[in-house]
Amino acid sequence: SAVTLGKFDGIHKGHQKLMEKILAKKDQDLKSVVFTFGQMPGTNIYGKGRTILTRTERQIHLEAMGIDYMIECPFIPEIIQMEPEDFIKKILVEQLHVKYIAVGPDFRFGHNRKGSVGLLKQLAPLYDYEVEVLEKERLEDKVISSTYVRHMLESGEMEKVHKLLGYPYYVSGTVVHGHKIGR
C-alpha cells in the first residue's frame, strides 16, 4: 500500500499534496491509505481544540479525491503506548503491507511522539518501503497548517480559508426549532 499518516484536519492544500503522492502510486498497483488518528476525547467541531471537519466530512473529501481507504486509529492505550518501531512493524508493515510512505517533515508517532521521519527512513531498507518527506506548502509566505486555517476562520477571512483549503469552507448541522419566540 501507499500510506500517508497524520491528523488531516481540514484536508488543506498541504494535506492534499501528500494525498496526491500516494494516489500517484496506483500505477504500481498500490492501494492508497490515509492513516489518521481518531478525535482525542474532549474535542468538537471548529474552534480551539476542535476540528475543522467532522469525521464524516473528512471521509467524503477523501472519497472524492479517490483515496481507497481511510483508517482512523482510535486513541486507546495499546496505540498511545506503542513504541515507534513496533508501530512501523506491526501496523505499517504487517497490517498495511506498506511499500510507500508520504509524510510532512514534522511527522511524529509512537509513545511520547518518539518516532520521527528519521526513524521511518532508517527502517525503510529493513522493511522494504520507500519514504518521501514533503516540505510544507506555503501561501503568501506563510506555512499552511490546520492551526492557520482555524485562525483564519476565527478572523472571518473566508477568502483566505478558501485558498488554504482549496475548496469553500462550509458548516453543516441540524436545524433545531426552539420556542419560536424570535418571530
Regions found by a protein language model. Give the residues of each.
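Structural signal for conserved beta-strand scaffold positions within catalytic alpha/beta enzyme cores
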Residues: 34, 72, 133-135
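Active-site cores that bind ATP or allylic diphosphates and position pyrophosphate for catalysis
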Residues: 89, 93-183
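N-terminal Rossmann-like or analogous alpha/beta NTP/dinucleotide-binding catalytic cores
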Residues: 43-127
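Active-site-proximal loop/turn and secondary-structure-junction residues that shape catalytic pockets
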Residues: 38-41, 76, 137
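Residues at the starts of beta-strands that form the adenosine-phosphate
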Residues: 29-33, 69, 130
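Generic detector of short, locally flexible boundary/turn motifs and exposed helical patches
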Residues: 1, 35-38, 65-70, 96-99, ...
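N-terminal catalytic cores of NTP/NDP-binding nucleotidyl/phosphoryl-transfer enzymes
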Residues: 1-55
